[in-house]
């Protein structure tokens, strides 16, 4: 009997149904329990996994590496200096070669087209560890964290504040719409998500009943939120836009005043961040921003980051469990005839 997931790639959330995404979230929670209990789950024994990184990473690389090892697979890291995608060798040729040697491929880089071509030509499952457009592996971890905290996904209100046209905003909007989560993007008009992404989300919301909102009004956007979510103000490759972004996004910083505007501080409220976070001056970027712009915190204050509302480290750990679920489901020959 065919498995729902076997042999499939995870390139963008919109390629998966609500039931499939819910299954991956629940399977992630199950594998986390096995890990905590010390129960082996070597579903990928003898498999070899290529980890392709055009963009640097702490969490994604660590999560894929430990997840692969826990599953009994051997991960092989190939950094930007090790791969020639489109430079000295076409993506197609690279994909064919890697597909003949590895059983699965993770890609973290810039172009969505590259990860799609890897999947098209390699003949093995390919997992998108982040592109400029989508971040699907992060989504399974994020909604896993939401479900662990609230016991459900449907009807939860998640508000993303910050740069509304980056990959995190895209993925949260579309994935939430698929899962029946009410998603609001609260951002300056200049940084609203693209019409293409909004239209994807609207179509999914019609089916799931999710309520969507795109607004530049902070008070309106965050009122009644269960989850406040933010990300760095400047994405990788956009470092020249620091000044522009700092000036645009200052009003969208997650701070205690914003939490009060949710009118839910005494209820069910958590704060998520995919990390790294610029919540103090203990980084080179933090020092530079403090020196140039006179602010010691960017997208989230240190007070909120370290408060009882912060779930960012729980969320980061869940990257490993969710990536494990994704790889096991798509490569592990598991009996999943339906979801």
Swiss-Prot record:
Transmembrane segments: none
Molecular function (Gene Ontology), one example: amino acid binding
Location of this chain's protein in the cell: Cytoplasm
The EC number(s) this enzyme carries: 2.1.3.3
GO cellular component, one term: cytoplasm
Key word Transferase present: yes
Domain of life: Bacteria
GO BP, one annotated term: L-arginine biosynthetic process
InterPro entries: Asp/Orn_carbamoyltranf_P-bd, Asp/Orn_carbamoylTrfase, Asp/Orn_carbamoylTrfase_sf, Asp_carbamoyltransf_Asp/Orn-bd, Orn/put_carbamltrans, OTCase_ArgI
Pathway: Amino-acid degradation; L-arginine degradation via ADI pathway; carbamoyl phosphate from L-arginine: step 2/2
Residues that, per the record, bind L-ornithine: 167, 231, 235-236
UniProt keyword terms in alphabetical order: Arginine metabolism, Cytoplasm, Transferase
List of residues binding carbamoyl phosphate: 57-60, 84, 108, 135-138, 274-275, 319
Keyword Transferase tagged: yes
Reaction equations catalysed: carbamoyl phosphate + L-ornithine = L-citrulline + phosphate + H(+)
Top enzyme category: transferase
Family per similarity comment: Belongs to the aspartate/ornithine carbamoyltransferase superfamily. OTCase family.
NCBIfam families, per database record: orni_carb_tr, PRK00779.1
Function: Reversibly catalyzes the transfer of the carbamoyl group from carbamoyl phosphate (CP) to the N(epsilon) atom of ornithine (ORN) to produce L-citrulline.
Protein name stated in the entry: Ornithine carbamoyltransferase, catabolic
